[in-house]
């Protein structure tokens, strides 16, 4: 019998070296031969044979290790391959290729190939089928619930698995389709205590190897591309996140922050009212700002920008209400009448994408009358910017889309556009446990006189919601007031204000103060889904927290009672309920006002809130360390309180006790006895006289070290216990706990996945699958647990609804998790990770229970009867349940608790010192569950009770005495720290670390002047005594606290930061070896307050000292090469493995160095240091003359860790060399990550394909030329923007063009070249940018939707209505809207977008170029140099910017030695320049800098009137241009259109500052904002940022080529610099560069129209696709405009506006460029609009005639274009129209200036009579026509109006009959015309006005003719106003009915009688004739009859 292993190859090795392999089986090892100088692959091709005596067992192992071989040192392990031989035993022969794993059990890239044969004597090898491996019998399910942290803890649970599976016994497959993993249990399954003693199996095989093998057995090679792969899920943590407890020390909320709210009021539409003069008021909090007033219009246009600045805590900010109101005819004397308002809170805006609403319509409603409906719309932008928020401003270009008001309402996503009015009922029943709020002096006086003892508080409740307040009555002198009142608010539903604030206040004669505050988030008490519910809550108790209960006149923590910051003590609890009722506003009996009103409500029963239960809280203090030394001199005790129970200093106010007795809940004797009677018999015996013990006995602290003390508890641990009575609402907390645990588990898993991705470990997708696996299992477990609960007492509506919705959500989440799990592939990990992060947010949201039950527990440290520091522990975290999942996460566990100072004291440096660290055990449960309260304590203690005797077993102990203790040694391997806080004025620190563990502490050595200390020190803590059972300490060891300090020569060390860690624990009986030991170095994040302050690289291990003493511990073998005295270095095996690296440094120059100690820097030098080695630059002899270095490249060699993540930082220091050999530190910079500077040799494969044949790049969609691949072809006609892969749109465009060529009529003529200018190009480009943005957004939305649909489709089991995640429905809604809108547009041909005229375009970047092109640091990097102490959060004034004292320009390149020779053998390799080949010289160079400033947008107002008078200031070196004369008056969006030329010399003048200042008539001008541009980096960048490459080459016209070098010259230069072959121009418009061929046009037209041959187009094609050129290609900067934010140093981090500009640079040693492009603002064109009012008809009749009561009107028509004040014109009056008909023949003439590109009229006028100069306004071109009734004595009456937008208005009707109201109401659906295109138009238009019901009605019709002429045309054919010459109009033929009673009675009779009674008269006449006929008939018939009869 023998086992033969054929070792074939090992591939994907890193670096170059000698390799050797070692193959081990049954303890016998063979070594392979040594392969020398292997690079990528080692071909061993060797066989090893083991003759064996006994059969090979299925679970025996084969191990192969691959090493780097070294003759001198020990061989270094590359990786290991281990394999279980089960498959070999069964099949006899196997070929395997698999990846190796490293020491950490992580798969690495290196792959091994082997072949194994097993020869048995009898040939008994079974055939092994796939099915067997995949099918696992169901009955085994239970046994595979292995622990999730088994990899971490090293515990191996292999019981119950069949032999021969993996060591873990984790069968990874079951029959596909059965649901893959056996369900992971959510709660941690407790294992028997002796489990771990089995010891760690030394070789844990990674579950993943099994997975891979299993796949291969099925003949599959790539594990993650196939469906089976989705089976591979890893549910154990891969990264060791457990060792990093995340403990936040400082309260995060409550600290004030800078906010800026900007509101742009653009316009209003459809305002309700007649002939109004509207003003818009924007109100935020107390501040109000108003727009200007617009006269006589219902759709005013404002475009005014307002800014509000705040400095408040976030919570206060987000609760502020933004109120937008429209007021009619407000002036100095009158406040005006309110038209309507719109309200939302700041938080709603902040939660929007980008923190803003852009161009949305706010719907106004009338707060005084809710039955009226919509009162109009205001279009506005609202943005909320916090410090450091970066807001992308959408470009302010096209406004066509936003006219659809309904589709663009200012509402968050998910809120329906039709909001209804609703009543919000807040019922206030009663309160309990109020603190006293008056000093007792007066009370004592009163008591002495009157003899009564009153409660010292007069409470009432204040409720605030949506900017309104309501309050209850005041209950005098009552600690337990009963109100039974309700506050009723009327507000739109859903409301846009998220929180409701309920506050108990104390009524006082001087000022009322808050007792406690509670916020109710409406989103948490409602659900907006299909099966959702309206906001509802209670009746439930809410707990209020705030300052401590002792009353002082000046309470320093009063803010806490107002709800700011975390409450530090229980204040009271309040019984409330909330309900909402949607109103039907049509019903008559409804109250129409929105005022808040109060009503009494009936009392509710005691039991409504749940059954009263007795709760028991037990706590034990196992350790109290790190007590701040300030309080270390007096005895200290700890007090634990829950509600008012346990509070001995200022707890229950005595008079209230009598009441408490009824409920059971106090401390007097009769109460106890009463309780005993109520309780069951045995309890009565047990509890005999159980009184609470809420505090520990005082004890004097003992010193730990110079900063901290500890309490000497040793083996005697004090305990506390409290009995309290609360309503039993544990179910709420249980559900919350389950969800919290699921969320914690999910968060841990996701952090792990992120860590795997970050550290580039293998298979993050498997871990993510495992996470989703666990999530879906946990969700289904939640549903079963939540379903079980049947206890209904005290259940509120919210409880029931919330449970239903939580179950629905969890079910759907579980389904989605299952679905997503199947979609996780290697390439989708990041996307899916984002999706799963949404789950986490949803879980956290669901877990937050809005209805409180048991108050939180507070632990106070008390010294000298004063409260010093506290910790607050949510009661749900320590709540006990028999079901594991429902138990609080800290219940019955020992936890580290850190105490902190209360309130504002906890902010800033004072709050950073730990006040005390407690190791504490807490348990809270029902008194009847009390038997379990000691269940989780570390075992080995005896109880010490207060009372001795029989029958008191159940009395809790007052202390525990531990007899069992374990002795440990802690080893803290402190390797290094990086990016520490700069604590000294030099900008550096002298850091040392202090490590605290239990009651011990030690320090590292102090390293001076560094922010990245490498201590490399092992701290050994001997004889650390820990109490408790060994196994528990192993699984959950105590926390280690590491604090970093800066050593100061004088005074005490300054705190730098703190981090926490947990050690890896080894018990005596465990083996010290892989995979758990030795521990790996890890980075721990250091925090200073809430700010990250660096990282610590360290490892910690806790080793149990057994009976053999320290001798048995693993030896400490440090490196032998250095002797550091008593300091132990970090031992081998833990310290990183080092390799030799060379670091090359490019020294370019220094810039902007500030003075040091008032002296200028003259002779600076740069020192570079990394890991103890370094290099110095050459000395700059005269910094002023030339700040560049003479020697460019230097290098040094250094040993660095092979693991890139452990690389130490590189330090850059600049020193100034002064006389007498002194040198002074100027500034320093630490490069924390060297990763981006690591040199990677160019990919050989990339070089090889250069020889495979030419690649032709083609631009046209025709079939590709068959040369090799693709071809670039640009005809002279194609579109300006060329992309290599033509996307769909472009193909469409091409098709369209071809159609056009075929002779189809083109809709819009090509614009004439002479008409076009630079601005045409600019506006066309902006439109393109907007279209691209829109397309991107649409694509993104579509992708998201598709993703949702995929998930929905795959999880089809979900009931249709449960599925949608929040926010999917509204999307669909908006999509429908869009599609209907599009349909509308397409049905009528006019609204379709006209095809864009062909204009050459440029690139508009809506950010600065630097962010688009990596700050132009492609080879030259800028390192900021810092000096001075870093600022903390509260030193708002010290920002990092202020610490910058200069910049070092240079670069780094590091690579492993030795370097391959190919690189150095390259042609022209300069050994002096190392890796920095082909870098230009850094000699001074003269450059012409040309700066183009286009415009600024959204400037911060600088004047009192809310405007600014901006002008441009440009600084570069000594040049300083102030364009003060050309300031632009009162503009926040000024168009500058200027260019400036400056000559500069690099490097002395390289920082360009462009600033916008505000011009002031008196005093100095203020800076609005500035932006800085580093021109040098741009100049030298490979992206060629000197002058943008235009899209087309033209020699004349608006798009003339502006670079002095033509494209062909540029291309030739680039090819030469990049050592490329080419350019070779060939026939047929081809050019070849390297191996690419480009095609393009070859002719050019000059000004005279002659065509000539040119290569420029071809060269330009190559330049525009330069990034595709192999090896040297990169994107060249196109012709562009960049948008840069303006910042003001006084308001750091908040944008003050934006500026659009670009910069060109031209070297002075080449031919000079042509003149600058003219970008001066377009002058508006002068037009004249002539409006002839011919007739009116059907005008409503307003006047009653004095004599006859007859209706008539005296009609005249008024019109204006710019504004009523500016150019109002009236016709004459048509008196006494009885029919509504009026004849005028009257001409209005309106001259105006018009900007075609912006479609705006430009007016210049003085803003007020006091204004210094005229202000320019741009307003839309709208013609207003109104019809009025003239009155002689009173004011004229307004009858109706029409407003025509001259760019698009409905075509007039041909006759008055066809003219209808629809022309106004359905304007969007009708075809529209533009007067600028039609020039002349005539027709009938309706006049409209609103009636009493605010509905539009027709009030008349007007026949008018509009005629537009340019100023020149108007001059040639002048006309007169009215009916005057020239070209007079004839007088109308009016019926003369004025004053005619006396003049012409007949005519008037005709008018009055005939007009009104004509039908009556006609009917009467007809009747008369009929009667006459009948009479004549009757009269003549007898005679006629006689005649007939007689036959006469």
From Swiss-Prot:
Keywords: Calcium, Cell membrane, Cell projection, Coiled coil, Cytoplasmic vesicle, Endoplasmic reticulum, Golgi apparatus, Membrane, Metal-binding, Repeat, Signal-anchor, Synapse, Transmembrane, Transmembrane helix. Ca(2+) 3 binds at residues 1503, 1558, 1560, 1566. SUPFAM superfamilies: C2 domain (Calcium/lipid-binding domain, CaLB). The gene is otof. Residues 1-1958 are cytoplasmic. Belongs to the ferlin family. Residues 1980-1992 are extracellular. This is Otoferlin. It comes from the Eukaryota. It is a single-pass type II membrane protein. It comes from Danio rerio. Ca(2+) 1 binds at residues 984, 990, 1046, 1048. It is found in: Cytoplasmic vesicle, Secretory vesicle, Synaptic vesicle membrane; Basolateral cell membrane; Endoplasmic reticulum membrane; Golgi apparatus membrane. Key calcium ion sensor involved in the Ca(2+)-triggered synaptic vesicle-plasma membrane fusion and in the control of neurotransmitter release at these output synapses. Ca(2+) 4 binds at residues 1831, 1834, 1837. One of its GO terms (cellular component) is Golgi membrane. Residues 1356-1399 have a biased composition (Basic and acidic residues). One of its GO terms (biological process) is startle response. GO terms for molecular function: AP-2 adaptor complex binding; calcium ion binding. InterPro entries: C2_dom, C2_domain_sf, C2A_Ferlin, C2B_Ferlin, C2C_Ferlin, C2D_Ferlin, C2E_Ferlin, C2F_Ferlin. Its cofactor is Ca(2+).
